[in-house]
Amino acid sequence: MNNTLLLIILNFVGKIFSFVREMIFSFTYGTGDITDAFNTSTTAATLIFSVITYALSKTYIPTYNEVVKNGDEKSGDHFTNRLLDFMLFLTTLMMILGLVFAPFIVKLFAAGYSGEKLKIASLFMRAVILTIYPNVYAAIFSAYLQIKGDFLTPALPLVIMNILLGLTIMVSKGNVVIMAVGIFLAYFLQYVMFPRATKKAGFRREKISFGLDPNVKKLIILSLPTTFTMAAVYISTIVDQSFASIVAPNGGVSIVNYALKILRIVSSTFIIPFQITAYPIIGKLVANGDIKGMKDLTGQSLVKIMTLFIPSIIGLMVLSEPIITFVYYRGEFTYQDMIATSQVLFYYSLYLIGPALADLLYLSFFSHQNTRVPTIIAFIQLGINIILDFVLSKAYGLVGLALATTFSQFAAVLMALIAYYKYFGKLNYPYILKNIGKIILAGGVMGAFAKFFFAIRPSNLWLLVTIALAGLIYVGLVYILKVDEFDQIIAAFKKKKKKLE
């Protein structure tokens, strides 16, 4: 729990810097062409990276554990070296293709782009594509360091990147070349801490060899379905962005991205830390054949996530307009932009329940080296999302895209729960539902208070007061209602506080 708490704090700090960066961006560029180009290009390049890095992060840990179990830690390091060699070869090919075909890739993500807007987006994308080496390096060694118990180093890149991007936006003043150079430096230098950390963990680089190691070959075969899983998720994102660029050609992509960036603060702060710390433990439980322990940990992690996550969703929905006003409404970001973004944020908020549940359930499948089930679910979800995008965007515009994503994600959760029951048996549903019921009750009271209290004196300062008081009310209610996992969260905070003292 202490590692989870540390990750929550670090992710929150990173997202504060992300918030500041977005405030600077919205003030400087609003929802204009440069903002659209930046959002589309960085999203496109990042999603391409993530298809690979996600597959590596989900298949490296179980493969490494198996190699060490059959040999020793030296064997695990040898396997890691051979994997890094193979990925250097693969990413070189990807980088060349990305640099050559950048305009075509941008058009896939935003069919409505043309002329100068397409040129700017292509320039920005090439800047990010050049950083593919450190991205893949970090994907492998983030998992390696987590196995070794270092959860701090993999959490630092977000802070470094957002500081550098914020500085870039401030000094660029509309100069797209300065923006491109700054984007490259931000994405490249965010991983500056990794070489020292891996050396400290005991890793030593071996001489480069491009022979295909049997364990690397096994990981590649294992990761193919996982790659398709992530590809399906990102094809969905491509479709959403393309529809956004058509439904609202002037600023539609930026409006959707501004809303999603706020949601990602909640996701990366409250979901990802629990998954990062739970995954190596689940992997070890599976390796030891402890299926009951795996299911118990999954249920406990789910309740812990929901304890922090449900009130965040309720707060985002109730205070969507004042939150968008506080973060973005200044400079080139207009009143119409604020209204449109707050509406999209409201309907996207419920979507986050999907990744919180589905991704946690998938960890058990990945630990069993079963990547087929998550892949099938992801592609069914993709089909549902595309159909709903087409239907709902015609009727409701950008809000329709948010609804389509939300409904398709709920379908994925239902399929994941059915598959989990089929392969591993029941989770402790009475325990889970009892606690989630209490959390929803406490969150509902908190949301009602926040809505009416903010209405007394609407302002940015009053918003902060409202959030603080609503948070205290929620904590008090959860404590009174005796949500099971809440005691562990409080104990971890107290333990961390004593260490700091």
Question: Predicted segments — roles?
Answer:
Residues 54-70, 271-302, 362:
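Helix-loop junctions and terminal segments of transmembrane helices
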Residues 84-108, 299-331, 339-356, 386-387, ...:
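Alpha-helical transmembrane segments of multi-pass membrane transport and lipid-handling proteins
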Residues 452-501:
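Membrane-proximal transmembrane or re-entrant/amphipathic helices at the cytosolic face
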Residues 152, 160-192, 372, 380-418, ...:
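Membrane-interface helix-loop junctions in multi-pass transport and translocation proteins
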Residues 113-138, 333-361:
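Alpha-helical transmembrane segments of multi-pass membrane proteins
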Residues 195-233, 292, 422-440, 491:
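Interhelical loop/hinge segments that connect adjacent transmembrane helices in multipass membrane
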Residues 133-156, 350-380, 391, 395:
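Membrane-interface junctions at transmembrane-helix termini in multi-pass inner-membrane proteins
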Residues 2-26, 186, 190, 194-198, ...:
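Transmembrane helical elements of multi-pass membrane transporters/channels
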